Amino acid sequence: MHVSALLLLLGTYSLVHALTVPGTSPWPDKHLESGLRIAKRSVPYEIAPRALCPQVWWTIATELKLSFLGVGGCNNLARQAIRAAFHDCFVDGCNGSLMLSGECDRSENNGLEDICAQLPTVRAKYGVGMADLIQFAGAIAVEVCPLGPPMPFYAGRKDSTTPSTPGQLPSVTGSGDQLFNMFKAKGFTATDLAALIGAHTTSEQFFVNKAKAGAAQDTTPNVWDVAYYGQMLAGTAPFTFESDKNLAAQNDVKGPFKGFVGNQVAWNGAFVVA
């Protein structure tokens, strides 16, 4: 299962700033117009002037936005950025090891080649941390997709060149209980997991079934919408991972999963919270 989230949830122990990125999405959102959110991790968000955010992140945001935009919405590089954010975080926390220790070459990270090539170049150009940049790129990618929510971002993670243990990412053939327990052990609720897996709304698979390479998990892979939930349950999606079917039927997850069908506001809210 290539759940493509955990953007901001692991490895954020030494955070310096928190921000959302107004104006990174070409689709207007009133929440993006109110300004930059900056705060210490331990206190509530506060609206603060853009000047309080290091300019480098605004520069990177502009550059990434342009590279993530495609015809009709977000493109394949954006999809890779969303997935990479999850893959870097899940095993040992968000520490940049995905791109600092050769993990991109593992079979479990097939399909991330383009983002694994791009982000180290951006890091070298601007002198930011790899762990921070991977999560920032994932957040920008979500916002660039039409209907994507504004994503808070926390800077200050510690980079690591120590590879994570291979084979620890959720499996595309995992049972519902197995997958739920993996996430529960990391502090996620059933609603969190149901929301996070919805990132498959922008997913296209190339390696699970090579005969159907490029098949999406719903009919609108360029849009951050809830079509994934309804189409997966109805069996009308172009392609569905076995793990997704299993999670949608899992006793704890199936309720919130069904609750996101046709409910964009509820899903966006749950995804950001998760």
Task: Report residues per predicted region.
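Cleavable N-terminal signal peptides of Sec/SRP-targeted secreted and luminal proteins
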Residues: 1-18
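Catalytic cores of secreted/periplasmic or lumenal enzymes
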Residues: 17-274
